[in-house]
């Protein structure tokens, strides 16, 4: 060999930094059915791009399964009775070729369940002046508390509690009108300790008026063999009537019955007037 020197060449090796996700907070809590806050992703390397995939508990829905860049706001639903979670696995990549990938980081959205009222029956009926049955409210979540307000139609009804928490107590309610009264208890369930508010429900108490029977004339005089024509009236529309009939004398043709008109042919078999009592 001649040991002749060659022509030098310069070789430049660029060593790109490995990016990292630098968000200080990597989780948030929301209530089922509400919208999460968008997540602006940050890195220690300018120009870093992000890709992410999401996995959630069975029973959660509404979240985006994958994406790039920031994590957008999402309305997430849950049919769970305990807290669920959506976990976003975020991979940062540097801006220059070969786009070095950093260590994946997990961002978690915890989804607290929203309670619902689960009572099988949501109504009852009483007559005015009677006492309601107390209503023990139930939910799909054991720690649920309830607040409720009552609205009465007509507003003249008395005896009901205007608002309260948890059990709706037994109450003696008076409806002095001639129409059916309705008291609607608007119930809002909330989950303790998360405070998540569920879908409101209504419990209804129907308060029926007590009808009063009346006739145009309370005392009528008839000749034997004449048919009565006594129209029965009431202060409450739709009232039905039943009656019993009796007489201390010798009267034929009377009897118990039902309907809106008492039509009976009464025959006095004696020589003296006798009353018939309905």
Each model region followed by its residue ranges:
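Extracellular low-complexity Ser/Thr/Asn/Gly-rich intrinsically disordered segments
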Residues: 1-278
């Amino acid at each position: 060999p001649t040991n002749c020197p060659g022509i030098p060449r310069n070789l430049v090796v660029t060593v790109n930094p490995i990016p990292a996700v630098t968000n200080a907070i990597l989780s948030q809590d929301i209530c089922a059915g509400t919208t999460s806050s968008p997540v602006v992703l940050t890195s220690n390397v300018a120009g870093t791009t992000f890709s992410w995939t999401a996995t959630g508990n069975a029973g959660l829905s509404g979240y985006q399964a994958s994406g790039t860049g920031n994590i957008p706001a999402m309305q997430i639903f849950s049919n769970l009775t305990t807290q669920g979670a959506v976990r976003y696995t975020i991979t940062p990549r540097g801006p220059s070729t070969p786009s070095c990938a950093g260590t994946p980081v997990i961002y978690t959205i915890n989804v607290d369940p929203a309670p619902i009222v689960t009572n099988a029956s949501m109504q009852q009926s009483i007559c005015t002046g009677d006492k309601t049955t107390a209503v023990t409210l139930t939910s799909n979540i054991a720690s649920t508390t309830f607040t409720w307000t009552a609205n009465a139609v007509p507003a003249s009804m008395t005896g009901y509690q205007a608002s309260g928490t948890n059990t709706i107590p037994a109450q003696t309610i008076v409806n002095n009108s001639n129409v059916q009264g309705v008291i609607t208890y608007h119930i809002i369930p909330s989950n303790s300790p998360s405070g998540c508010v569920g879908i409101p429900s209504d419990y209804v108490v129907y308060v029926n008026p007590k009808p009063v029977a009346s006739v145009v004339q309370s005392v009528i005089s008839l000749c034997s063999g004449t048919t009565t024509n006594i129209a029965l009236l009431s202060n409450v529309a739709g009232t039905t009537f039943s009656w019993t009939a009796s007489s201390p004398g010798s009267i034929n043709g009377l009897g118990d019955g039902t309907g809106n008109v008492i039509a009976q042919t009464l025959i006095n078999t004696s020589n003296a007037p006798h009353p018939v009592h309905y």
